[in-house]
Amino acid sequence: MKNLIKNKIKLSTYNITLIEHFIRFLIKGWKKKKAINLLSLSLNYIALTINKDPISTLEMAVRYTIPVYLEVTPSIITNENKTLWHKRFICKSSKVRTFQAIKWIIKAAKEKKDKSLYIHLAKEIVDASRNSGKAVKYKEQMENKLKLAQLHM
């Protein structure tokens, strides 16, 4: 813990919107300083354990967990006598897909209970940057649901 505080990465030096989005999703029920501290501790943990740039691993993690372009939504088609349920495929914007990837990474880190959250967040970011982990499994589950919906159209 002492090494993490001594070698603290200052998030203010990185003017990246991805970090701001991570802080925004971590801030629920907390103060902003706690969310910034949690993210900086997890980035320091990444820098100490894998000896790579933590910002680039964060970007790779989000890139690997971004879901596909399409989303299945039900829509109603009404004729003269009948109402039919029809599946529509809607394209998501890149911003929404990035938000979904960040939510999946944070959700996968919060599901683990044995250690502190910054360690779980760091490990999940590293796993997602290696294209494995729970966040990538969430993405694969969503892709499988989309394929099943396309088959049943």
Curated annotation (Swiss-Prot):
This is Small ribosomal subunit protein uS7c. Its main location: plastid. SUPFAM superfamilies: Ribosomal protein S7 (SSF47973). Belongs to the universal ribosomal protein uS7 family. Keywords: Plastid, Ribonucleoprotein, Ribosomal protein, RNA-binding, rRNA-binding. Part of the 30S ribosomal subunit. It comes from the Eukaryota. InterPro entries: Ribosomal_uS7 (IPR000235), Ribosomal_uS7_dom (IPR023798), Ribosomal_uS7_dom_sf (IPR036823). Pfam families: Ribosomal_S7. The keyword Plastid applies. It comes from Helicosporidium sp. subsp. Simulium jonesii. It is found in: Plastid. GO terms for molecular function: rRNA binding. One of its GO terms (cellular component) is ribosome. One of the primary rRNA binding proteins, it binds directly to 16S rRNA where it nucleates assembly of the head domain of the 30S subunit. One of its GO terms (biological process) is translation.
